[in-house]
């Protein structure tokens, strides 16, 4: 393809749309990151960045964080709501609350909080959904607005700690998820002498569409029904504490792709708010929860991996709907809170690792079968002869299907002992030759050819063995078929020569990335430059900053990867800071209650028993190094 251009690469990988301007492809075919939108001219080539890290002793795979992206996401979301509030003359403000469950890493939380350090009145709070998360935010929320929202199921200790947060100077909203929690709150607040700030989670009838739609609707795991909400109001009235009810919360689910779902959910919840006000409750905060989506595939659609709206449209719809409902009821407009953790964090992190080997289907030249060979092989040779003789376009599909049928029959005959191993191998190579030839002759312009093209792209794709664990670094790709953009980090200035699938290094057949962003759609293979064992071939997995680290598991005892924070200074200098080593072998053994120290003693006993004295020290040293080493592959020499 001689007319290939960088624009073709940008369109082919759809970088312009899913990257939100943070990532791109340079004119030299290198994937770049521009973490600071204020200075878009300052770019880092990810390939060179990774090489610099390796030279500095940071082994791949490495998770690279760009904190300036976090800063931009926080401020752009606040700005979108501020502009919507001004546009619709909304009579209250907006507060962004970060739910730390999305990414609890200290670096991430601190950078999010630091994003508004210069603001006189920060528009930022924190959310906790468990006791450990609450203990964390109690020590960090004062760096922003000191607002803490407590969600999740609660016991007396959780509630007591939340109330202690009020004594520490925080504004802690305890959101009731179950009716039984109210009794505990009333009792603990009385013991501590603290007036609680109560919220309640409404269980809406409306249910948004998406992978997390079970978070909303009448069968939701969380929230109070209309009748239960009225019971809460009655009990608070009886205790002369109705003024404590200050926040209404609802949650449609993470990654809501359709803006109409958001409008409908806000509309229903807005009526809950106004009805509560009319009952005498002092509710003044309207928490829309999560749902603000990330366009993982860049298609701007209603697919589970995308969204059909932008940030401005999201803020405008929430503010507009709530303005109209409050005006209809003649009720004061509440502070709007959102818990948009996925939006804040997804883009800021990219996993960079290396391809350690490939397996390609290379068709061999075949000779006609011997005259005494089974008729089936002669049929396959006839199909190959038709293709090599440039068969009519209309016959291509028929020839392909005949070849597939013949191959299946050959494999069956081999299993019955009626075909030799050599004859089976010949049949497989003949089929492979037919597939390669058909692939080159089919046309995407012919709609009857397209399914066969997709099938052949998958069948003939190279296998790239990539130094990472899907279960540790991209668990949502395995668990819920989440799409993450995947790109080779260099060589994109030339037309891709191959199509490939990415396989991890676990001993599990599920350890494969089976969906790839390709143009304006999702494909089962990825167009890539050819791999060479002579030079490093680096791959980037993008938009992995939300949920993936904390959800990752240690399948095959592959642990946390190395990580690093990278920042571009105002003078354009790249600064690699706070490199954090990933798990060692000893670390992951300890997680599953295996004692590396005891293992070392056992090694010594075995060495003394089986190894000659002059070799013992070297063997023991290698075993010691093995326990201290990275869980991923490092030595390819």
UniProtKB/Swiss-Prot annotation:
Q: Name one GO biological process term.
A: putrescine biosynthetic process from arginine
Give the first-level EC class, as a single word: lyase
Recorded superkingdom: Bacteria
According to UniProt, this protein's pathway is:
Amine and polyamine biosynthesis; agmatine biosynthesis; agmatine from L-arginine: step 1/1
Q: Which family does it belong to?
A: Belongs to the Orn/Lys/Arg decarboxylase class-II family. SpeA subfamily.
Gene Ontology terms, MF aspect: arginine decarboxylase activity; metal ion binding
Q: Gene3D superfamilies in the record, alphabetically?
A: 1.10.287.3440, 1.20.58.930, Alanine racemase, Lyase, Ornithine Decarboxylase, Chain A, domain 1
* Record-given protein name: Biosynthetic arginine decarboxylase
Metal-binding is among the record's keywords? yes
Q: What is the catalytic activity of this protein?
A: L-arginine + H(+) = agmatine + CO2
Record carries keyword Lyase? yes
The organism is Shewanella sp. (strain W3-18-1)
Pfam families to which the protein is assigned, alphabetical: Arg_decarb_HB, Arg_decarbox_C, Orn_Arg_deC_N
Ligand binding (substrate):
286-296
